[in-house]
Amino acid sequence: MTQVNNWNELVSVLEGKTDVLFVELLIKVNRHINSNRFNKNFNPTTVIKSQQSIFDTFKLIFEQLSIETDTNEIFTEITSLTTNNTMTFLMTGVGKWIKFHGKETSNIHFIDDEKTIISDRTLADFLNKITEFQNQYTYFGKKPLVYYKFKDLPSGEILEYIKTFDVIPCVLTDVTPSLNYDKDNFESTLLLDQASVLTLCSNLSWGYSDTFYQLSQENKTKEQVIANKLEMDNLILGKRLLVNKSVYDGIVAKIDFTAGPTEKNRFENISKYLEIVEDCINPRFLKMKDSELICTSVAERECATIVTNNKHVWKKIKLFYKEIPCKLFVSVQLTETKYN
């Protein structure tokens, strides 16, 4: 491991990294350095006592990112779904929260005869809060794995006490296991949104009529839609095709009131291959709203790749929930009744 003893050395090692979390950490370090440009005591070639703690935190994250390679976020704030409480974890992955202990552990002990209260206030406060958060969040139907990493492990009886809170104690050099879920299922299972199903039925994606494209007000070219439809055909081939209940009801209403006879016939044929699944809501997808929340929650429950035309949804999933695969397609409307 490269020796990092001051701000300049920390910046130097981070500048040699291209992974997104190292880049994010570098931005935070540079922001801190810039905020101290008028501090007469600050010197980037050393670390003053008042800033040792924040420096050690940045350095720890740098070191741990090379160990915990499945990390997808740093400085993560987890919000309680029922109270105003929050907890901050320096590193998190999919269904995996990691807390770090920055003090000596040899003197951690019980201060009561019943052995229910420990002397380390920081650790005690964490353990008192963690159950509330663990019970509220699920990842692929499972509670998050919570790890507490120590430089040196405390005594055996303290370790057993920590484990009673479903917290896994370990040392800094340990590579903590990831949450186990059915990643392979994403390859074989698709969750289609309304626009995707209607595109599969629409004359615009089948007849490729120049007349339709001249009349369409959408900013799409004929070539785009043809290529898009062929790609969708290849994607759905041999896959398990899911549509959640509320979306399916919307599709049926749209077909009944808008589709022409050919488009209705296509929908009947496609429906033979669609599996209707119940809606659900997982509150951990706080960044998503309304139908987006239902879609993402169902995709997680079913381990299904989302197929959508909604660029806004696609961007949010890519940014906040990378564990849910999402395919973005150009969609077209039902046109047979309108243009014939």
Curated annotation (Swiss-Prot):
This is Uncharacterized protein R220. It holds the Pfam family DUF1308. It comes from Acanthamoeba polyphaga mimivirus. It comes from the Viruses. The lineage of its organism: Viruses, Varidnaviria, Bamfordvirae, Nucleocytoviricota, Megaviricetes. InterPro entries: DUF1308 (IPR010733).
